Amino acid sequence: MRPIDAARRLKLSTSALRNYEAQGIIPPALRDPNGYRKYTEEHLAYLECIAAMASGYGMEVTSDVMRLLRARDTASALWLVNEAQALLHRDRCLAEEAICRFDLEERGASDPESEGMTIGEAAAETGVPRSTLRYWEKEGLIASSRDEQNGYRRFSPPQLRKIWLLRTLRTVLYSADSVRLKQAIRKLEDNDAERARDIALEALHYLNRLNQEQLRGSYYLFRLCRRLNLLQ
């Protein structure tokens, strides 16, 4: 198959195919007797797997997996996929935890009128590093006030809500949906606890969709491994 035909079939550019070859994530193209580049069914299996995995695992993980498969290191490739799945499961647990916290707040089981937390306290409570909190503040996603007595940053309860929400999306893939959710968090009003819970639910639905995308990618990965005779 000519590269142009493979590109059209997978809705890619021929330059993308050349980049994949240069990055070592697909085998080099073969040459016909006239010297023209051509792809085999094995190339197509690689390309279909990359397209399927990228939406759920991202190109970085997908590329690393393809290189490991080309080196016939199946075990490392599959454990890398397993690690990505574990991270997604962790993010789902974080989203569910945020929803539970907002439910408790709505029922009055927490104190929304507290003085908030210092950056160290917020980092310890949420598990988000101080450097990340400073970065989020620099990007305008959260805001802090200054303690009048010592000048330390303090995050109010509404800002802590934002931190819990952003923590849920901290490691997810860059996508239009993740950007939209972060913008919703940025615009979240201090007194709108109900909207905070809605955003947490939207984040959970987004993670559920990613889980389905990972399943689809795993199916194509299985097909590729079987074609390459990498499975026992």
Annotate each predicted stretch with a short phrase.
Residues G116, A124-G127, E139:
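Amphipathic alpha-helical protein-protein interaction segments
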Residues A6-A7, Y20, A122-A124, W136:
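Short alpha-helical "recognition helix" segments of helix-turn-helix
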Residues L17-P33, R130-Q149:
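Major-groove DNA-recognition helix of helix-turn-helix-type DNA-binding domains
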Residues A143, D147-F155, R227-L231:
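Long amphipathic alpha-helical coiled-coil segments
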